[in-house]
């Protein structure tokens, strides 16, 4: 995780962000990881489309940590999928709760797994 000042410098390179509101309700907690993996793959497709539309610095922040690989190496240096791996917003010092609330989206800490999740991904656009 980079220091906050490095995160600020990174975000200063972007003028806009698109917030993706993703909802889900899992019957079993272990279903969250494959669900998240599939959502992340779809979000990468969106990022690529925006890139091909001329926004060459488009960058997606997944709704949680990168879960693209079934077995993560745990470090960027050893990652076997560096081209597609992306951080979650919290790893770049984004306060997701405050950010999404400021634009009217719902978010709360869930008390049980039978509650619907409100998850958020962010597409940064230059």
Regions found by a protein language model. Name each.
Residues 1-126:
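Catalytic cores of enzyme domains
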